[in-house]
């Protein structure tokens, strides 16, 4: 049978557990909750080259977004500026400069009104949502406008 803990051993165990809890609960450079896209700063802007009539040659064509994606030098500079505007103080690497209306759904690639700093891991979760909405548009389950509206609502209300 195990011997009972001495008062000192008990105190050390409690302190160790408290330290672990504090370390795990500590935010890592950004708020614990999602950064919502501010409708005033980031209302979302569409790419005029993408329409319902041409989705087969644009957003539904494999690899198309790579042809319009802005360079990292542009998005990192914008991310730095927008993080200050959004009051975010974490490391740049903790955020993705995300498109409110994604490239996969016909969002403008470079307009700052379509981009904002979204923290990880939420940014990665939203990438999956963007891909799912794109698949629904390309399969005819949703119109382009319906998918864009859903994405706008999600990012302005859920992060």
Each predicted region: which residue ranges?
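Nuclease and nuclease-like effector domains acting on nucleic acids or nucleotide cofactors
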Residues: 1-95, 105-159
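Short active-site segment of divalent metal-dependent hydrolases/proteases
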Residues: 102
């Amino acid at each position: 049978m195990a011997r009972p803990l001495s008062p000192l051993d008990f105190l050390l165990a409690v302190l160790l557990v408290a330290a672990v809890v504090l370390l795990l609960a500590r935010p890592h450079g950004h708020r614990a909750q999602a950064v919502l896209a501010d409708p005033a700063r980031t209302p979302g802007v569409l790419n005029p080259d993408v329409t319902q009539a041409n989705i087969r040659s644009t957003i539904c064509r494999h690899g198309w977004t790579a042809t319009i994606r802005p360079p990292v030098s542009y998005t990192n500079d914008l991310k730095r500026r927008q993080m200050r505007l959004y009051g975010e103080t974490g490391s740049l690497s903790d955020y993705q400069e995300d498109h409110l209306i994604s490239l996969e759904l016909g969002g403008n690639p470079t307009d700052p009104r379509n981009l904002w700093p979204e923290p990880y891991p939420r940014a990665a979760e939203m990438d999956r949502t963007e891909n799912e909405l794109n698949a629904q548009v390309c399969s005819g389950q949703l119109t382009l406008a319906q998918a864009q509206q859903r994405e706008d609502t999600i990012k302005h209300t859920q992060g």
